[in-house]
Regions:
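Active-site-proximal cap/loop segments of hydrolase catalytic domains
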Residues: 522, 527-528, 535-732
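Conserved beta-propeller blade repeats
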Residues: 57-72, 107-125, 144, 151-169, ...
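Predominantly five- to eight-bladed beta-propeller fold
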Residues: 32-38, 88, 171-234, 248, ...
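Short, solvent-exposed loop/turn segments at conserved positions within beta-propeller repeat blades
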Residues: 82-87, 127-132, 207-211, 271-278, ...
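Cap/lid segment of the alpha/beta-hydrolase catalytic domain
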Residues: 268, 450, 457-580, 587, ...
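Beta-strand-rich domains and repeat architectures in extracellular enzymes and scaffolds
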Residues: 52-88
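Beta-propeller blade signature
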Residues: 89-94, 136-138, 214-221, 277-286, ...
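C-terminal motif of bacterial Sec signal peptides marking the signal peptidase cleavage site
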Residues: 23-25
């Protein structure tokens, strides 16, 4: 259930790309989109950050340095609220002069830029032909030329360094995997039923209809791609990259361009629902052979200089990255089967010896977004004390007598999130956010980690609005530990006044409350409406060591709930906090937290808001899809009467305490949320109303676990603040 972290994602959902960026069915080219993100005279005069102002912001991403480090290509997405869609364009920055040039206009979506090895050509995805295909253009300027011309959309791609081959991802119908009645009964073409014999009927936001993402390799000649070869297998019902996020960072060419490494979870049905066992596979172009490097027949795995044979790597293994000499493949690995939030270890596979070495055995944090600087140096991003920082790891020489790996060096510091980075030509550029700043580019000094801002995509907006400040607060918990809590203050904060205050409950549950900028749960937006926001890093979040992270499993109703209350009680002692006007809000696991706190808050709060939260543990077990998550975090199934951890979890399900509910609650859900299905919201709404509690149900018929579409987002925020204003801000 852990939400996808932006530091891990090159792209998010295909559905989001199709509907929010304006592709619709992904078969018709959208009409050109008029972009006007200038603030109105009224917005400038008010100087207030509002949902409508937020949707005028440009969203930067996709930063890629040229091979010599002298140029930086990236994307910016702008939205038209009235049209309810956005458009993405490519931009190019000259690193020496700072000059920025827009490469594509707003008549089509242009995403996922990548450089050729010589730095002369830019490849990218575009829907300008009517479907999403690979295009290329001269980096110096010129008209784009089409590289692929397939009937179906290309959902991701990569050109090898020699420039003679391209991998691409497409959704294909797998023979024998049909799940739709019209496919199974050809004489009943208007029938609409999904038919299943095993689990995983639904995943995240879609029904399994027998269509899977497959990985293809095609020859590339004179800038044109031939028909590709499906290296997964045309009759294989597996996804590459893995479902449900389909992150193309899970696929990587070797530098010689002769091999392709990728991630796959080769399971189906009940096995898929119960397991996190994905592996790294390597396809050899010359022989056509594929090898699973995580489970070789005679594999050897090295941990702390000890070699163990036949270690199966039963958890998530993802994100292969080749060393410059192609001898090694670095990847991220989780040791515990079925535990999706386990420590992300940084592993190194030796292509000569098949040995796998754990490079971060003593590092108590995740290692994400891994990149090689040279054959002996790795860089990665790690969550550390409520922030994301850039780290460097020096490796011993292959022939060194002592093969012990030193601890990584944390290069950057400060209250920010480094969400992605690109490095080339001795230069590093990072995409950085804070709770007061949407994504911008910063150059990172590799020696001392100093950040120098490069971009200012939303300067015209920041210049005309007032944002509050963010304070770091360490709160003592009930068991004597210190908990980092972010406190976001309203603009023009006056400590002599009293402010309504919100407790924010994080989702995941294993997701850090960091310096992220969110377009869904935006703390700056909440503060701009006059609320103080209290955001604790309660038990169960990463970036504070494994003990802090793992405590929550099997203890949802325990210490982390007490942590929430410690945070709000600590802030409520401040003279500027109006303890008679407190609210509590959260999504996903945070929504569960809201439901649980509604039954035990002892009249602290005047209102609750739960978005896509778990209400009834027993019905949730039969409604969700990735059962490995519940089995690990609840402890097992509700029928395991001899399992004390599971029985304790189910005994403390929020629905068991509805008789104690006494506070107005707003309940929000998405009808395409198959992780925490909307039926959980219906149960909670029914319980609240039958107990005479003021309640409101908001169900978005075209959203899933999160709300992405522009107008839906504005409605979400209007409902959110309308509820809080009525029951918290205006409380008597």
């Amino acid at each position: 259930m852990k939400k996808p972290n932006s530091a891990n994602m090159k792209k998010f959902f295909l559905l989001m790309a199709c509907t929010v960026l304006g592709l619709g069915s992904c078969t018709e080219r959208p009409q050109p989109l008029e972009i006007d993100n200038a603030l109105t005279a009224e917005e400038i005069a008010a100087g207030r950050f509002t949902p409508e102002v937020m949707w005028k912001m440009g969203r930067l991403g996709g930063s890629q340095l040229s091979p010599d480090g002298k140029r930086l290509v990236y994307t910016v997405t702008y939205y038209n609220l009235g049209e309810n869609r956005g458009v993405t364009a490519l931009y190019l920055r000259d690193m020496a002069s700072g000059e920025v040039r827009q490469l594509t206009d707003h008549t089509s979506n242009n995403t996922s830029p990548a450089w050729s090895a010589d730095g002369r050509t830019l490849y990218f995805l575009s829907d300008r032909s009517g479907t999403q295909q690979v295009w290329h253009m001269a980096a110096a300027g010129g008209e784009p030329q089409q590289v692929t011309a397939f009937d179906a959309d290309v959902e991701g791609f990569g050109v090898n360094k020699p420039g003679d081959a391209i991998w691409y991802v497409q959704t294909v119908a797998v023979p024998g995997a049909e799940k739709c009645s019209a496919d199974l009964y050809k004489d009943m073409p208007r029938s609409k039923a999904h038919i299943y014999d095993d689990l995983m009927a639904r995943h995240w936001n879609y029904w399994d209809e027998g269509r899977y993402r497959h990985l293809f390799i095609a020859a590339l000649t004179d800038g044109k791609a031939a028909e590709g070869v499906d290296i997964v297998g045309a009759d294989t019902a597996w996804d590459v990259p893995t479902a449900p996020y389909f992150d193309t960072a899970e696929i990587a060419w070797s530098n010689a361009g002769d091999r392709l490494a990728y991630t796959c979870k080769p399971l189906a049905g009940t096995d898929y629902a119960l397991s996190t066992d994905s592996d790294i596979f390597v396809y050899d172009r010359a022989s056509g052979r594929t090898v699973n490097i995580c489970k070789p027949m005679e594999g050897r795995v090295r941990f702390n200089a000890m070699v163990h044979r036949n270690t199966p790597f039963p958890g998530y293994d993802k994100y292969p990255v080749w060393s410059p000499d192609d001898r090694y493949i670095a990847f991220r690995s989780m040791a515990t089967p079925g535990y999706e939030a386990d420590k992300e270890r940084l592993m190194r596979y030796d292509c000569r010896t098949a040995e796998i070495t754990d490079l971060t055995p003593s590092f108590d944090y995740h290692a994400t977004n891994v990149a090689w600087a040279d054959d002996r140096t790795l860089w990665f991003i790690a969550p550390m004390e409520g922030t994301y920082q850039l780290c460097r790891l020096a490796l011993p020489a292959p022939d060194a007598t002592c093969g012990t790996v030193d601890l990584p060096t944390v290069v950057t510091s400060g209250d920010h999130d480094i969400n992605a980075f690109t490095m080339a030509g001795g230069r590093i550029v990072a995409e950085v956010t804070t709770m007061r700043m949407a994504t911008e580019q910063f150059e990172v000094d590799p020696a001392d980690g100093k950040l120098t801002q490069l971009s200012a995509v939303n300067k015209e907006i920041y210049d005309h609005i007032r944002l509050g400040t963010v304070e770091k607060r360490w709160v003592e918990t009930t068991d004597g530990k210190r908990m980092l809590t972010w406190v976001v203050l309203p603009p023009d904060f006056d400590p002599a006044k009293k402010y309504p205050t919100l407790l924010f409950c994080e989702g995941g549950p294993q997701s850090v409350v960091s310096q992220a900028w969110s377009y869904r749960w935006n703390f700056a937006l909440m503060a701009s409406q006059g609320y103080v926001v209290v955001a604790p890093n309660r038990r169960g979040v990463p970036s504070f060591g494994q003990e802090w992270l793992e405590q929550i499993s099997g203890d949802y109703s325990g210490q982390n709930i007490r942590d929430y209350l410690s945070a709000i009680d600590d802030v409520a002692r401040e003279p500027w906090c109006d303890r008679d006007r407190l609210g509590c809000v959260g999504a996903s696991y945070g929504g569960y937290s809201v439901y649980f706190l509604a039954g035990c808050h002892q009249k602290r709060f005047k209102a609750f808001i739960a978005h896509c939260g778990i209400f009834n543990f027993e019905s949730m077990y039969g409604q969700t899809e990735e059962l490995f998550f519940i089995n690990h975090d609840y402890g097992g199934a509700y029928w395991e009467k001899d399992n004390p951890t599971a029985m304790r979890s189910y005994a403390n399900s929020p629905h068991k305490f509805v008789d104690r509910w006494d506070t107005p609650i707003l309940i929000v859900t998405g009808e395409y949320d198959f992780r925490i299905p909307y039926t959980q919201a219906l149960e909670a709404f029914t319980a609240a109303r039958l107990h005479g509690i003021p309640a409101r149900l908001v169900a978005f018929e075209d959203e899933a676990h999160q709300v992405f579409k522009p107008q839906n987002s504005v409605v979400w925020n209007r409902e959110f603040f309308g509820w809080l204003d009525k029951y918290v801000k205006e409380a008597r």
